[in-house]
Protein backbone atom coordinates (compact mmCIF):
# COMPACT_ATOMS: atom_id res chain seq x y z
CA UNK A 1 0.00 0.00 0.00
CA UNK A 2 2.95 2.29 0.71
CA UNK A 3 4.88 2.20 -2.59
CA UNK A 4 4.46 4.40 -5.32
CA UNK A 5 4.71 46.76 -14.48
CA UNK A 6 3.38 47.70 -17.90
CA UNK A 7 0.93 45.55 -19.67
CA UNK A 8 3.30 44.89 -22.55
CA UNK A 9 6.08 44.09 -20.16
CA UNK A 10 3.74 41.86 -18.24
CA UNK A 11 2.68 39.96 -21.36
CA UNK A 12 6.28 39.65 -22.47
CA UNK A 13 7.21 38.13 -19.16
CA UNK A 14 4.31 35.73 -19.12
CA UNK A 15 4.02 34.70 -22.75
CA UNK A 16 7.60 34.93 -23.94
CA UNK A 17 9.41 34.13 -20.70
CA UNK A 18 11.95 36.93 -21.21
CA UNK A 19 14.60 37.37 -18.58
CA UNK A 20 14.27 40.38 -16.33
CA UNK A 21 16.95 43.08 -16.35
CA UNK A 22 17.23 42.61 -12.60
CA UNK A 23 18.62 39.66 -10.76
CA UNK A 24 16.52 36.52 -10.98
CA UNK A 25 14.76 35.70 -7.76
CA UNK A 26 14.17 32.02 -8.34
CA UNK A 27 10.96 30.10 -8.75
CA UNK A 28 7.52 31.37 -7.92
CA UNK A 29 6.09 30.54 -4.52
CA UNK A 30 2.46 29.94 -5.35
CA UNK A 31 1.09 28.73 -2.04
CA UNK A 32 1.69 28.05 1.60
CA UNK A 33 5.05 26.48 2.41
CA UNK A 34 5.93 26.52 -1.28
CA UNK A 35 4.12 23.41 -2.45
CA UNK A 36 0.76 21.62 -2.47
CA UNK A 37 2.26 19.05 -0.13
CA UNK A 38 3.18 21.78 2.38
CA UNK A 39 6.78 20.52 2.53
CA UNK A 40 8.17 23.95 3.47
CA UNK A 41 11.33 23.01 1.57
CA UNK A 42 12.98 25.62 -0.70
CA UNK A 43 16.03 25.28 -2.97
CA UNK A 44 18.27 28.33 -2.58
CA UNK A 45 21.55 27.53 -4.38
CA UNK A 46 23.77 30.12 -2.67
CA UNK A 47 22.49 29.75 0.87
CA UNK A 48 25.15 27.48 2.31
CA UNK A 49 25.74 26.86 5.97
CA UNK A 50 28.64 29.31 5.92
CA UNK A 51 26.68 32.09 4.22
CA UNK A 52 23.83 31.61 6.65
CA UNK A 53 26.10 32.75 9.45
CA UNK A 54 26.34 36.20 7.81
CA UNK A 55 22.70 36.70 6.93
CA UNK A 56 21.39 40.16 7.79
CA UNK A 57 18.25 42.23 7.56
CA UNK A 58 18.13 44.80 4.76
CA UNK A 59 17.11 47.93 6.62
CA UNK A 60 16.63 49.84 3.34
CA UNK A 61 13.91 47.39 2.27
CA UNK A 62 10.85 48.88 3.95
CA UNK A 63 7.63 48.20 2.06
CA UNK A 64 4.67 49.23 4.16
CA UNK A 65 0.99 48.48 3.93
CA UNK A 66 -2.09 48.54 6.11
CA UNK A 67 -3.19 45.64 8.24
CA UNK A 68 -2.28 42.80 10.50
CA UNK A 69 -0.72 39.92 8.60
CA UNK A 70 -1.34 36.29 9.40
CA UNK A 71 -1.14 34.92 5.85
CA UNK A 72 2.19 33.96 4.34
CA UNK A 73 3.28 36.28 1.49
CA UNK A 74 3.54 34.71 -1.97
CA UNK A 75 6.00 35.34 -4.83
CA UNK A 76 5.11 35.62 -8.53
CA UNK A 77 8.43 35.32 -10.38
CA UNK A 78 7.38 36.37 -13.95
CA UNK A 79 6.56 39.88 -12.67
CA UNK A 80 9.01 39.72 -9.74
CA UNK A 81 6.43 40.71 -7.18
CA UNK A 82 5.36 39.67 -3.73
CA UNK A 83 1.68 39.25 -2.89
CA UNK A 84 0.51 40.29 0.58
CA UNK A 85 -3.06 39.82 1.86
CA UNK A 86 -4.02 41.52 5.13
CA UNK A 87 -6.71 41.57 7.77
CA UNK A 88 -7.78 44.98 6.40
CA UNK A 89 -9.23 43.06 3.44
CA UNK A 90 -6.58 44.51 1.15
CA UNK A 91 -4.24 42.73 -1.25
CA UNK A 92 -0.94 44.29 -2.29
CA UNK A 93 1.55 43.52 -5.05
CA UNK A 94 5.03 44.66 -4.02
CA UNK A 95 8.19 44.81 -6.12
CA UNK A 96 10.46 42.10 -4.82
CA UNK A 97 13.63 44.16 -5.27
CA UNK A 98 12.72 47.74 -4.34
CA UNK A 99 9.73 47.13 -2.09
CA UNK A 100 7.64 49.61 -4.07
CA UNK A 101 3.91 49.04 -4.39
CA UNK A 102 2.87 47.81 -7.85
CA UNK A 103 -0.88 47.69 -7.18
CA UNK A 104 -3.33 47.23 -4.36
CA UNK A 105 -6.92 46.05 -4.23
CA UNK A 106 -9.39 46.77 -1.41
CA UNK A 107 -11.97 43.98 -1.24
CA UNK A 108 -14.33 45.41 1.36
CA UNK A 109 -14.61 46.28 5.04
CA UNK A 110 -13.17 43.82 7.55
CA UNK A 111 -15.24 42.68 10.52
CA UNK A 112 -14.37 44.25 13.91
CA UNK A 113 -13.94 41.88 16.82
CA UNK A 114 -16.61 43.76 18.77
CA UNK A 115 -19.27 42.44 16.38
CA UNK A 116 -18.03 38.85 16.32
CA UNK A 117 -19.55 36.25 18.67
CA UNK A 118 -16.03 35.27 19.78
CA UNK A 119 -12.53 35.23 18.35
CA UNK A 120 -9.10 36.79 18.70
CA UNK A 121 -8.43 38.58 15.39
CA UNK A 122 -9.32 42.29 15.20
CA UNK A 123 -10.34 43.19 12.62
CA UNK A 124 -11.06 40.00 10.72
CA UNK A 125 -10.43 40.12 6.99
CA UNK A 126 -8.05 37.85 5.09
CA UNK A 127 -6.41 35.31 7.37
CA UNK A 128 -5.74 32.15 5.36
CA UNK A 129 -2.82 32.14 2.92
CA UNK A 130 -4.05 32.63 -0.67
CA UNK A 131 -2.99 30.49 -3.62
CA UNK A 132 -1.83 31.49 -7.11
CA UNK A 133 -3.01 29.48 -10.11
CA UNK A 134 -0.57 29.80 -12.98
CA UNK A 135 -3.10 28.69 -15.58
CA UNK A 136 -5.51 31.54 -14.87
CA UNK A 137 -2.85 34.08 -13.83
CA UNK A 138 -4.92 34.77 -10.72
CA UNK A 139 -4.75 34.85 -6.93
CA UNK A 140 -7.51 33.05 -5.05
CA UNK A 141 -8.40 33.90 -1.46
CA UNK A 142 -11.18 34.09 1.10
CA UNK A 143 -12.06 37.44 2.71
CA UNK A 144 -14.45 38.08 5.58
CA UNK A 145 -16.34 41.20 4.46
CA UNK A 146 -18.71 43.35 6.55
CA UNK A 147 -21.89 44.33 4.72
CA UNK A 148 -25.24 45.81 5.76
CA UNK A 149 -26.63 42.29 6.14
CA UNK A 150 -23.70 41.18 8.30
CA UNK A 151 -20.39 39.42 7.71
CA UNK A 152 -19.91 37.37 4.56
CA UNK A 153 -17.20 34.94 3.56
CA UNK A 154 -16.37 35.65 -0.07
CA UNK A 155 -13.96 33.75 -2.28
CA UNK A 156 -12.16 36.08 -4.70
CA UNK A 157 -10.15 35.50 -7.86
CA UNK A 158 -7.90 38.50 -8.59
CA UNK A 159 -5.86 39.10 -11.73
CA UNK A 160 -2.14 39.07 -11.07
CA UNK A 161 -1.82 41.94 -13.56
CA UNK A 162 -3.67 44.57 -11.53
CA UNK A 163 -5.66 42.88 -8.78
CA UNK A 164 -9.01 43.25 -10.51
CA UNK A 165 -11.59 40.52 -9.81
CA UNK A 166 -12.09 37.98 -12.58
CA UNK A 167 -15.57 37.83 -14.18
CA UNK A 168 -18.08 35.95 -12.01
CA UNK A 169 -16.17 36.50 -8.80
CA UNK A 170 -16.35 36.80 -5.84
CA UNK A 171 -18.39 33.83 -4.67
CA UNK A 172 -20.49 34.41 -1.55
CA UNK A 173 -19.99 31.11 0.24
CA UNK A 174 -23.22 31.10 2.24
CA UNK A 175 -25.32 32.00 -0.80
CA UNK A 176 -23.64 29.46 -3.04
CA UNK A 177 -24.15 26.66 -0.53
CA UNK A 178 -27.72 27.73 0.27
CA UNK A 179 -28.54 27.31 -3.42
CA UNK A 180 -27.51 23.69 -2.92
CA UNK A 181 -29.59 23.21 0.21
CA UNK A 182 -26.69 23.57 2.64
CA UNK A 183 -26.45 25.90 5.64
CA UNK A 184 -23.19 27.82 6.08
CA UNK A 185 -23.27 30.52 8.77
CA UNK A 186 -20.55 33.09 8.02
CA UNK A 187 -20.98 34.64 11.48
CA UNK A 188 -19.58 31.60 13.27
CA UNK A 189 -17.27 30.24 10.56
CA UNK A 190 -13.68 31.41 10.26
CA UNK A 191 -11.10 30.86 7.54
CA UNK A 192 -7.48 30.68 8.59
CA UNK A 193 -6.12 27.59 6.82
CA UNK A 194 -4.16 27.92 3.58
CA UNK A 195 -5.93 27.37 0.26
CA UNK A 196 -4.78 24.95 -2.40
CA UNK A 197 -5.49 24.10 -6.05
CA UNK A 198 -6.10 20.65 -7.48
CA UNK A 199 -7.77 19.37 -10.63
CA UNK A 200 -9.06 22.73 -11.81
CA UNK A 201 -10.56 23.91 -8.53
CA UNK A 202 -9.48 26.06 -5.59
CA UNK A 203 -10.18 24.52 -2.19
CA UNK A 204 -10.89 26.61 0.90
CA UNK A 205 -11.00 25.19 4.46
CA UNK A 206 -13.16 26.62 7.23
CA UNK A 207 -13.38 26.21 10.99
CA UNK A 208 -14.66 28.29 13.88
CA UNK A 209 -13.42 31.29 15.82
CA UNK A 210 -11.19 31.08 18.88
CA UNK A 211 -13.63 30.21 21.64
CA UNK A 212 -15.65 27.65 19.66
CA UNK A 213 -18.84 29.72 19.67
CA UNK A 214 -21.96 28.84 17.73
CA UNK A 215 -22.95 25.95 15.53
CA UNK A 216 -19.90 25.95 13.30
CA UNK A 217 -18.57 22.97 11.36
CA UNK A 218 -15.45 22.00 9.53
CA UNK A 219 -15.94 22.78 5.84
CA UNK A 220 -14.01 22.39 2.62
CA UNK A 221 -15.43 24.33 -0.33
CA UNK A 222 -14.10 23.79 -3.84
CA UNK A 223 -14.73 26.30 -6.65
CA UNK A 224 -13.82 25.94 -10.32
CA UNK A 225 -10.88 28.12 -11.26
CA UNK A 226 -12.49 29.06 -14.56
CA UNK A 227 -16.13 28.49 -13.60
CA UNK A 228 -17.18 29.91 -10.21
CA UNK A 229 -20.53 28.16 -10.57
CA UNK A 230 -18.72 24.82 -10.29
CA UNK A 231 -18.91 24.27 -6.53
CA UNK A 232 -18.33 21.18 -4.43
CA UNK A 233 -18.29 20.92 -0.64
CA UNK A 234 -17.72 18.70 2.36
CA UNK A 235 -18.55 19.33 6.02
CA UNK A 236 -18.29 17.56 9.34
CA UNK A 237 -21.40 15.76 10.52
CA UNK A 238 -20.93 16.90 14.11
CA UNK A 239 -20.82 20.43 15.42
CA UNK A 240 -17.24 21.72 15.51
CA UNK A 241 -14.47 19.79 13.85
CA UNK A 242 -12.97 22.95 12.40
CA UNK A 243 -10.22 22.86 9.78
CA UNK A 244 -8.10 25.66 11.19
CA UNK A 245 -4.41 24.72 10.97
CA UNK A 246 -2.35 27.43 9.22
CA UNK A 247 -1.24 24.94 6.56
CA UNK A 248 -4.86 24.22 5.70
CA UNK A 249 -5.21 21.58 3.00
CA UNK A 250 -2.32 19.53 1.62
CA UNK A 251 -2.43 17.71 -1.72
CA UNK A 252 -0.32 14.98 -3.27
CA UNK A 253 -1.44 15.42 -6.89
CA UNK A 254 -4.38 13.05 -6.56
CA UNK A 255 -6.03 13.66 -3.21
CA UNK A 256 -6.65 16.34 -0.62
CA UNK A 257 -5.57 15.88 3.00
CA UNK A 258 -6.73 17.90 5.99
CA UNK A 259 -7.22 17.52 9.73
CA UNK A 260 -10.21 18.42 11.86
CA UNK A 261 -10.41 19.69 15.42
CA UNK A 262 -12.65 18.87 18.33
CA UNK A 263 -16.32 18.16 17.82
CA UNK A 264 -18.86 19.34 20.39
CA UNK A 265 -21.60 17.37 22.11
CA UNK A 266 -21.28 14.14 20.13
CA UNK A 267 -21.53 10.62 21.53
CA UNK A 268 -20.38 8.81 18.40
CA UNK A 269 -17.50 9.76 16.17
CA UNK A 270 -18.75 12.51 13.83
CA UNK A 271 -15.66 13.53 11.83
CA UNK A 272 -13.73 15.33 14.57
CA UNK A 273 -10.12 14.78 15.65
CA UNK A 274 -9.33 13.21 12.30
CA UNK A 275 -7.21 13.21 9.17
CA UNK A 276 -9.18 12.91 5.94
CA UNK A 277 -8.27 12.02 2.39
CA UNK A 278 -10.75 13.23 -0.22
CA UNK A 279 -10.94 13.10 -3.99
CA UNK A 280 -11.27 16.43 -5.85
CA UNK A 281 -15.06 16.02 -6.01
CA UNK A 282 -15.12 16.02 -2.17
CA UNK A 283 -17.41 13.01 -2.16
CA UNK A 284 -17.91 11.71 1.37
CA UNK A 285 -16.35 8.32 1.98
CA UNK A 286 -16.74 6.22 5.09
CA UNK A 287 -14.08 3.65 4.25
CA UNK A 288 -11.31 3.25 6.79
CA UNK A 289 -8.70 3.94 4.11
CA UNK A 290 -10.01 7.49 3.73
CA UNK A 291 -9.79 8.74 7.32
CA UNK A 292 -7.93 8.30 10.57
CA UNK A 293 -8.93 9.25 14.10
CA UNK A 294 -7.12 8.27 17.31
CA UNK A 295 -8.99 5.72 19.37
CA UNK A 296 -9.11 8.22 22.25
CA UNK A 297 -10.93 10.85 20.18
CA UNK A 298 -13.60 11.34 22.90
CA UNK A 299 -10.88 12.36 25.35
CA UNK A 300 -9.33 14.70 22.80
CA UNK A 301 -12.75 16.26 22.23
CA UNK A 302 -13.31 16.74 25.94
CA UNK A 303 -9.88 18.29 26.45
CA UNK A 304 -9.94 20.46 23.30
CA UNK A 305 -6.73 18.68 22.30
CA UNK A 306 -7.22 19.03 18.55
CA UNK A 307 -5.59 16.73 16.11
CA UNK A 308 -6.38 19.63 13.75
CA UNK A 309 -3.71 21.96 15.12
CA UNK A 310 -1.38 21.22 12.19
CA UNK A 311 -1.92 20.19 8.59
CA UNK A 312 -1.23 16.59 7.58
CA UNK A 313 2.17 16.29 5.92
CA UNK A 314 2.56 13.80 3.02
CA UNK A 315 5.93 12.06 3.11
CA UNK A 316 7.77 9.72 0.75
CA UNK A 317 10.19 7.67 2.82
CA UNK A 318 12.73 5.35 1.12
CA UNK A 319 13.21 1.88 2.53
CA UNK A 320 14.71 -1.42 1.41
CA UNK A 321 11.77 -2.44 -0.80
CA UNK A 322 10.98 0.93 -2.36
CA UNK A 323 9.33 4.07 -1.06
CA UNK A 324 6.69 4.32 1.62
CA UNK A 325 3.87 6.79 0.94
CA UNK A 326 3.04 8.13 4.38
CA UNK A 327 1.28 11.00 6.11
CA UNK A 328 2.45 12.57 9.37
CA UNK A 329 -0.13 14.14 11.67
CA UNK A 330 0.79 16.20 14.73
CA UNK A 331 -1.70 17.20 17.40
CA UNK A 332 -2.37 19.47 20.32
CA UNK A 333 -2.22 16.27 22.35
CA UNK A 334 1.59 16.26 21.71
CA UNK A 335 1.40 13.05 19.67
CA UNK A 336 2.80 12.33 16.23
CA UNK A 337 0.93 9.79 14.12
CA UNK A 338 2.38 8.05 11.07
CA UNK A 339 -0.27 6.95 8.60
CA UNK A 340 -0.33 4.92 5.41
CA UNK A 341 -1.25 7.47 2.74
CA UNK A 342 -3.20 4.89 0.74
CA UNK A 343 -5.00 3.46 3.76
CA UNK A 344 -5.25 6.00 6.58
CA UNK A 345 -6.51 3.34 8.94
CA UNK A 346 -9.87 4.43 10.35
CA UNK A 347 -10.32 4.67 14.10
CA UNK A 348 -7.03 3.89 15.83
CA UNK A 349 -5.31 2.61 12.69
CA UNK A 350 -2.02 4.49 12.65
CA UNK A 351 1.20 2.74 11.66
CA UNK A 352 3.01 4.35 14.59
CA UNK A 353 2.30 6.96 17.22
CA UNK A 354 4.45 8.62 19.83
CA UNK A 355 4.44 11.55 22.24
CA UNK A 356 7.00 13.91 20.67
CA UNK A 357 6.39 17.15 22.59
CA UNK A 358 5.84 18.26 26.15
CA UNK A 359 3.08 20.62 25.02
CA UNK A 360 0.60 21.36 22.27
CA UNK A 361 1.67 21.36 18.63
CA UNK A 362 -0.21 23.82 16.45
CA UNK A 363 1.92 25.34 13.73
CA UNK A 364 2.90 23.92 10.33
CA UNK A 365 5.70 21.35 10.06
CA UNK A 366 8.35 21.20 7.33
CA UNK A 367 10.18 18.23 5.87
CA UNK A 368 13.60 17.69 4.31
CA UNK A 369 15.98 14.89 3.41
CA UNK A 370 19.64 14.26 4.15
CA UNK A 371 20.83 11.43 1.94
CA UNK A 372 18.14 8.78 2.23
CA UNK A 373 16.96 10.01 5.61
CA UNK A 374 13.71 11.93 5.99
CA UNK A 375 13.27 14.56 8.68
CA UNK A 376 10.38 16.68 9.92
CA UNK A 377 10.76 19.95 11.84
CA UNK A 378 8.02 21.44 13.97
CA UNK A 379 7.64 24.21 16.53
CA UNK A 380 7.23 22.54 19.88
CA UNK A 381 9.12 21.53 22.97
CA UNK A 382 10.52 18.11 22.22
CA UNK A 383 9.74 15.30 24.60
CA UNK A 384 13.00 13.43 23.95
CA UNK A 385 15.55 16.12 23.12
CA UNK A 386 19.13 14.72 23.13
CA UNK A 387 20.24 17.91 24.91
CA UNK A 388 17.43 18.97 27.24
CA UNK A 389 16.87 22.68 27.75
CA UNK A 390 13.91 24.71 28.98
CA UNK A 391 14.41 26.94 25.91
CA UNK A 392 14.00 24.16 23.36
CA UNK A 393 11.08 25.15 21.13
CA UNK A 394 12.05 23.55 17.80
CA UNK A 395 12.03 19.79 17.36
CA UNK A 396 13.29 17.66 14.47
CA UNK A 397 12.14 14.08 14.00
CA UNK A 398 13.59 11.36 11.81
CA UNK A 399 11.06 9.16 10.04
CA UNK A 400 12.28 5.62 9.44
CA UNK A 401 10.80 2.40 8.09
CA UNK A 402 13.06 -0.52 8.97
CA UNK A 403 10.96 -3.50 9.98
CA UNK A 404 8.15 -1.05 10.79
CA UNK A 405 7.62 2.72 10.64
CA UNK A 406 9.06 4.69 13.53
CA UNK A 407 9.73 8.23 14.75
CA UNK A 408 12.72 9.48 16.72
CA UNK A 409 13.81 12.91 17.91
CA UNK A 410 17.26 13.74 16.50
CA UNK A 411 17.78 17.30 17.73
CA UNK A 412 16.07 20.27 19.32
CA UNK A 413 16.72 23.99 18.94
CA UNK A 414 16.44 26.74 21.53
CA UNK A 415 14.62 29.97 20.76
CA UNK A 416 11.59 31.94 21.95
CA UNK A 417 8.49 32.22 19.80
CA UNK A 418 5.74 30.48 17.90
CA UNK A 419 6.63 30.61 14.21
CA UNK A 420 6.36 27.79 11.69
CA UNK A 421 9.63 26.38 10.29
CA UNK A 422 10.81 26.15 6.70
CA UNK A 423 13.91 24.46 5.28
CA UNK A 424 16.38 25.64 2.65
CA UNK A 425 18.90 23.50 0.78
CA UNK A 426 21.32 24.36 -2.01
CA UNK A 427 20.19 21.54 -4.31
CA UNK A 428 17.33 19.71 -2.63
CA UNK A 429 19.58 17.80 -0.25
CA UNK A 430 22.82 19.65 0.59
CA UNK A 431 23.31 22.34 3.21
CA UNK A 432 19.92 21.85 4.86
CA UNK A 433 19.00 24.75 7.13
CA UNK A 434 15.92 24.89 9.32
CA UNK A 435 14.65 28.46 9.68
CA UNK A 436 12.08 29.59 12.21
CA UNK A 437 10.76 32.90 13.52
CA UNK A 438 10.52 33.98 17.13
CA UNK A 439 7.01 35.21 16.42
CA UNK A 440 5.38 36.76 19.49
CA UNK A 441 8.59 35.85 21.33
CA UNK A 442 12.03 37.31 20.67
CA UNK A 443 10.91 38.55 17.20
CA UNK A 444 14.11 37.28 15.60
CA UNK A 445 15.10 34.91 12.82
CA UNK A 446 16.83 31.66 13.79
CA UNK A 447 18.63 29.15 11.57
CA UNK A 448 20.02 25.70 12.39
CA UNK A 449 21.94 23.05 10.49
CA UNK A 450 19.37 20.51 9.47
CA UNK A 451 21.58 17.49 10.07
CA UNK A 452 22.97 18.35 13.49
CA UNK A 453 20.92 21.24 14.91
CA UNK A 454 23.97 23.46 15.24
CA UNK A 455 22.83 27.10 15.46
CA UNK A 456 23.97 29.03 12.38
CA UNK A 457 22.09 32.29 12.93
CA UNK A 458 20.82 33.20 16.36
CA UNK A 459 18.85 36.33 15.61
CA UNK A 460 21.62 38.80 14.78
CA UNK A 461 22.03 42.24 16.31
CA UNK A 462 19.72 45.10 17.29
CA UNK A 463 18.92 45.97 13.66
CA UNK A 464 17.74 42.42 12.94
CA UNK A 465 14.68 42.39 15.17
CA UNK A 466 11.25 42.21 13.53
CA UNK A 467 8.41 43.77 15.52
CA UNK A 468 4.90 42.83 14.49
CA UNK A 469 5.25 39.10 13.84
CA UNK A 470 2.07 37.12 14.39
CA UNK A 471 2.03 33.59 15.79
CA UNK A 472 2.30 30.76 13.25
CA UNK A 473 4.05 33.11 10.74
CA UNK A 474 6.72 31.56 8.54
CA UNK A 475 9.19 32.62 5.85
CA UNK A 476 9.36 32.89 2.08
CA UNK A 477 12.64 31.95 0.37
CA UNK A 478 13.76 33.31 -3.01
CA UNK A 479 17.09 33.11 -4.78
CA UNK A 480 18.95 35.63 -2.64
CA UNK A 481 16.59 36.76 0.09
CA UNK A 482 14.35 35.49 2.82
CA UNK A 483 11.11 37.46 3.23
CA UNK A 484 8.97 37.70 6.35
CA UNK A 485 5.53 39.24 6.64
CA UNK A 486 4.50 41.21 9.73
CA UNK A 487 1.89 43.75 10.72
CA UNK A 488 2.00 46.70 8.27
CA UNK A 489 5.31 45.72 6.65
CA UNK A 490 7.66 43.16 5.13
CA UNK A 491 11.19 42.30 6.19
CA UNK A 492 13.97 40.97 3.95
CA UNK A 493 17.16 39.15 4.91
CA UNK A 494 20.09 38.90 2.46
CA UNK A 495 23.01 36.52 2.43
Q: Can you describe what each PLM-predicted range is?
A:
Residues 27-319, 324-346, 360-385, 392-397, ...:
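Mobile, glycine-rich extracellular loop/lid and propeptide segments
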Residues 351-353, 390-425:
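A beta-strand-loop signature enriched in Asp, Gly, Thr, and Trp
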Residues 352-356, 381-386, 408-414, 462-466:
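Short, contiguous acidic/charged loop-to-helix segments that flank catalytic cores in large enzymes
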Residues 1-5:
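N-terminal secretory signal peptides that target proteins for export/translocation
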Residues 21-26:
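Sec/Tat signal peptide C-region and signal peptidase I cleavage site
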Residues 8-19:
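Bacterial N-terminal signal peptides
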Amino acid sequence: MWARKALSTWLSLILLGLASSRAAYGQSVLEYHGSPGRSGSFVVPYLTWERARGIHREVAFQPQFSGHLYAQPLFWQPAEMLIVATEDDTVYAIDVSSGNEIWKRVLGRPVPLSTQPCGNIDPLGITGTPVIAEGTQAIYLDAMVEEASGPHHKIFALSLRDGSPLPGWPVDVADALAARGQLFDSVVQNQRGALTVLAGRVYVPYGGHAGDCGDYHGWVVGVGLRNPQDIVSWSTRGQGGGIWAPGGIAADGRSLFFATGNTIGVSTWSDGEAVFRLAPDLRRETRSQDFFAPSDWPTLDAQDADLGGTNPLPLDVPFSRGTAALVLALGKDAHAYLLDRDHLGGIGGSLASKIVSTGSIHTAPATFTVGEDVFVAFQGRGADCPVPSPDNALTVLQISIGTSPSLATVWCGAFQGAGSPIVTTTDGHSNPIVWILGAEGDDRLHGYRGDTGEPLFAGGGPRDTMPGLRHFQDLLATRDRLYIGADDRLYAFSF
